[in-house]
Amino acid sequence: MANTVGGILSGVNPFHYNSSSPLTLFLFQACLILLVCNLIHIPFSMMRQPKVISEVISGVILGPTIFGQIPNYTNTIFPTSSIPGLNLVANLGIILFMFFLGLEVDIAFIKKHLKKALVIGIVTLAVPFGFGCLLAIPLFHTYANKTEGERHIKFSVFMVFIAVSISVTAFPVLCRILNELRLIKDRAGIVVLAAGIINDIMGWILLALSIILSSAEGSPVNTVYILLITFAWFLIYFFPLKYLLRWVLIRTHELDRSKPSPLATMCILFIMFISAYFTDIIGVHPIFGAFIAGLVVPRDDHYVVKLTERMEDIPNIVFIPIYFAVAGLNVDLTLLNEGRDWGYVFATIGIAIFTKIISGTLTAKLTGLFWREATAAGVLMSCKGIVEIVVLTVGLNAGIISRKIFGMFVLMALVSTFVTTPLTQLVYPDSYRDGVRKSLSTPAEDDGAADGLDSEGVDKTEINTQLNSLADVSKYRIGELTTVINTTEAISPSLKLLNYLSLGVSPKPKNNKHKNETSLSRMTTATDSTLKSNTFKIKKMVHIWSKSVDDVDTNLSVIDEKLTPFEGVGALRAIHLRLLTERTTDLLQSSSLYNDDPHFTANTDSLLQIFDIFSNLSKIPFSSEVIFSTMREKAANIATMKMDSTDLILLPLKGASYEYRGSPVFIDEKYANFDHIYSHLLGLNELSSTFFKSIFQSLKANFAVQISNTYGRLNADRFKRKRFNLLLPKPYLTQSDYLGLYLLLLICYRDGYNNDNASCSIFINSKNIDFAKDLSTAFAEHDWLNESTIKIVDIPFETKVPEEAIEKPSFIETVLDVGLSDTALADIEETTFIIGEDLPDESEPFSEEVRTVIFEGSNRRFDTLIVHHFSSE
């Protein structure tokens, strides 16, 4: 006893299993399992594979197949006496998993797509079930009841179980694949989601039937009793208890909470454990009781999402991986040592995959899908994953199948799950999906496109789509402004910029008695001008005949305004780009959001509600969307959004920030180099290392990155003058420079209407001698544009030559040193520097000048707006 208390210091072997202290070895086993699972998942995650594959493979590696071949490994690390402890934790995890699976079943969504879901779900279950019954015949005669001491299994029980194993579809894995491939909003994805729920429910019912048949011990009367009791228990839970629980939660205002209270969570867990206990003692399995309990939790106000978010972390991180790793430990591939064994393995894989694909494809085609859509639906329905492993483990523990058959079917589950994602991408590529969306677009949208009108009736043919000169800038217009919200901290700087860029219904300009006729001129130094003139030229009015019915009847002409590129009503779209993790909460939220009308997405997302309020106040047409994406797929998700070449995609990012570490003084740390701030940017905003390279190369619209470096300030002076500075460092202007100029002019124009008194300046390479004159000529009809509106400052600057050994200051460093006045430097935190970015080198995410601006902005605490113009030429 003394040695036991003393531990390893007293000579106790920590790998010796002690029944009086089983926790010691269990902790090591759990750490080993979780470590191997996460290491193996790294390469599989890059191939878009679900984590269950890594967890099962980890168990296979740690089990008798590989590590088990090491002498004394199994007796030391996983002794037989320690397995019950692992199984206890694993079974607790799978009970919670089945409860979460019940929470995922959306009855309202099934009703909405009931016809297609029933047809596809039943057919994709019935056809593989029938072929599974045929496969069970040779399997039974070859492997069943061959080992002495094993439980004798009837053929009917064996056949039902094998057929269920062949025919099930893994709904949780299916839902995650739909999210990762961005199919959950497509017609094929919606059909598969509904059919997967039907298939899943019916599969669990059939599995329960096989367990009941095996537990009845040959008595038909017992079988009937178990079936009746199970059905009665389901009715009790699904009707009186379900409505009673909803009534109690409403009366206690539980559904209105941001997260469930501990008491409500405890009561729901109590309901789940009671149901699992009851189904276990009547001879079914505790997982079915947990599944039934998940079905009765109300979905009002996304309560199931909030409940799952509160409960799921420890089960998903610890318990469930241990369950699937234990399933892998039971796989001994060394038992498959005959040719016929591998013949049955390949036959099982072929039957499981192709019966699902063929039946799903034909049925989906009959319901109205295109051939490739239907094929994708069939491929997705062939996914096995988590559910298959649970089914097989239940069958192994019940003695229905042997370890050899268990190993065969685990291989089938791994292969069928592994091929689902690449096969879906092969038969249903992005290019084909875009064509399907266009063919399914509404006639109203097609008519609008054919008429050349945007959402507000502005003639698109009069809007220039290219930016090759200052004359093009005067005719340019942004189609739709889309802001992609990646983090909560990006909301405030995004709204500040949108307040200047938004093209809402403009108020009428104030009349001024005195008109400033000063033209644009160049300045060699920067000085603060007087308050900006609010003078705006009276808009040109043209007489046109009205196209409205009322005016046609009265035969009256009306006066209409000819909108300039800086006027009119442009639409605003807000995209909440949420990180898709392994959490069940993300799956519940994504599936529930896409069940609603997409025009009302803002009502279900608190971040989008902020932009909805902003658009209402600004009188801007507004739409919104929530996109769940993995970190690796964020660039692809943004690039595949519906957009035109003249749209502007704005991505606000959180940059450098002040830190408060317990003292009343803020910590303002400086960055040593660009790589330091760049890694900080990626980490803060949950972006992959290839994000910017991918987005610049694949996005088919204008793109702007806003980096806010002033987050964390307290008591900021809200009345300081806002400053917007455009940097034109090249001796010539590129298309992205022209886009930056257009945005600066747009900010100036809107600022004149709003009377915000912002300062707008252009810092240009002094080699662009005729820039001011050319700008005045191009905007001769725009009297609002003069030197009181915008300042042009010459910056003597020589472009760096790579071969030169002497380090020269960058353009932004020169501007900060000699181009800004003392007042402007004092207001540097209220300043946004705009710079154009053409396609950077493949080896770097940004060009050298842009990298310098980002670096200086992070250390000097000014905001940066990097713009890139997309050219279809």
UniProtKB/Swiss-Prot annotation:
InterPro entries: Cation/H_exchanger_TM, CPA2_transporter, K/H_exchanger, Na+/solute_symporter_sf. GO terms for cellular component: endoplasmic reticulum; Golgi apparatus; membrane; mitochondrion. Belongs to the monovalent cation:proton antiporter 2 (CPA2) transporter (TC 2.A.37) family. This is K(+)/H(+) antiporter 1. There is a cross-link at K562 (Glycyl lysine isopeptide (Lys-Gly) (interchain with G-Cter in ubiquitin)). Residues 45-51, 104-116, 176-188, 242-267, 338-341, 397-404, 748-873 are cytoplasmic. It comes from Saccharomyces cerevisiae (strain ATCC 204508 / S288c). The modification Phosphoserine is found at S557. GO terms for molecular function: potassium:proton antiporter activity. Potassium-proton antiport. GO terms for biological process: inorganic cation transmembrane transport. The lineage of its organism: Eukaryota, Fungi, Dikarya, Ascomycota, Saccharomycotina. It is a multi-pass membrane protein. Its main location: membrane. Residues 1-23, 73-82, 138-154, 210-220, 289-316, 363-375, 426-726 are extracellular. It is found in: Membrane. Disulfide bonds: none annotated. The keyword Transmembrane helix applies. It comes from the Eukaryota. Present with 172 molecules/cell in log phase SD medium.
